[in-house]
Amino acid sequence: QRQMCIRDRGKTRPAVPKRTKSEQGIVVEGLSNCLVKFAKCCTPVPGDDIVGFITRGYGVSVHRTDCPNADPARRKPEEKGRWIKVSWDDSTRENYSTTLEVVAKDRLNLIMDISTVLSATKTWVTNMSARTTNDGFALITIEVGVSDSTQLSTVRRRLEQVSGVLRVTRPAGR
């Protein structure tokens, strides 16, 4: 069982901060043997700019820097020391889960066309839900597994090319 994060508080500090990577492919500056989890509000993937937050009892929560929950303007003064520098390790795992939201003009075979794009881009789909609004739009939420932000950008671009799709976004700060 891994321990929660423990800050190095020795009297003498090395000139270079300690860099320890986690099993999730995250390097946490100044912390060793640290539990790392990805924030569900913004679901970061390799290539995203990220920041860490030392939680109470759950290790370091990794957020995208553009996540509203990680916005420096919204940070509480008493939590200042709990925001830490984190980065992606060069050797990351195969798939990272994130969410895409698609808004499209509803039409026959829309889901099939979206599924075709996901298959063609070799994108893992772990969950997909869709609903139609009263004004004829389709709102589709897709949980996908991607290797990095480059693959995610490709998937987004290809989905935006599907007939009737108005926008494809990545939610942040749920």
Describe each PLM feature range.
Residues G10-R13:
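Flexible, glycine-rich loop/tail regions that form catalytic "lids" or insertion modules at the edges
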Residues V28, K40, T55-V60, L100-A104, ...:
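Hydrophobic alpha-helical scaffolding
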